[in-house]
Amino acid sequence: KLSKAHEAQLKLKNRRLYQQRLAVDAIALIVNNKNALDELSISELRNILLGETKNWNEIEPSKLKQIQVVFDHKHSSIVKYMVDSITGGKPFAGEVYAQQSTRDVIDKVSKNKNTIGLIGVSWITPDLRGRNKSAAEYYQELQKNDTTTLDFNDNIKVLKIRRDDYPIAFKPYQAYIFSGEYPLYRSIYVATTAARGSLPHGFLTFLTGYVGQKIIQNTGVLPAAIQPRMVQVN
């Protein structure tokens, strides 16, 4: 969402701003499958990012060594979110490393049992295994109302996260992101100053309409206008 300062600049230029909430993205924490840890609290995550918790055995009994944190790149929006929302404005400290891409983060975690990775939840899809869907498959998925199923890489697992004031931890399933029970989420907005009836404004209308929102839902990101539902799989 544009800041108040940006909105003021547009107003000075007599530009009318059209801005709408498009989706809700979540940040997933991934670890190597050889790591026995299944969940983290927000305060435990904060202590890791600030370098106050340095080793895995400080969280629970473990033979693993020093914690290494990896994220996609040095200008990452994930880092900005973590600093703004988790560390209280304090910069990362300790063994924290920027990679070149999210794919590099996934590869690093899959090969290093001491590493924890920060990635966008939209990366946790069947495409993680390199599976290419046909146009027909995508069309069939658009007709479904089911919450996107998380398909995890064999070498990594996604941690559950819990709030400090709540005893239950949650994975980043769409329903839990929607309810706010999964705490690591952020809103995505679409904005334009183009006039109504123009191509850019039409694209905004498409993105926030039913078809656009269904497409967003199938990327693994939670659309703003479509309420997810949980489906039990036995």
Annotated model-derived regions:
Residues 2:
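Glycine-rich phosphate-binding active-site loops on the catalytic face of alpha/beta enzymes
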Residues 8-25, 30-234:
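Exported/periplasmic ABC-transporter solute-binding proteins
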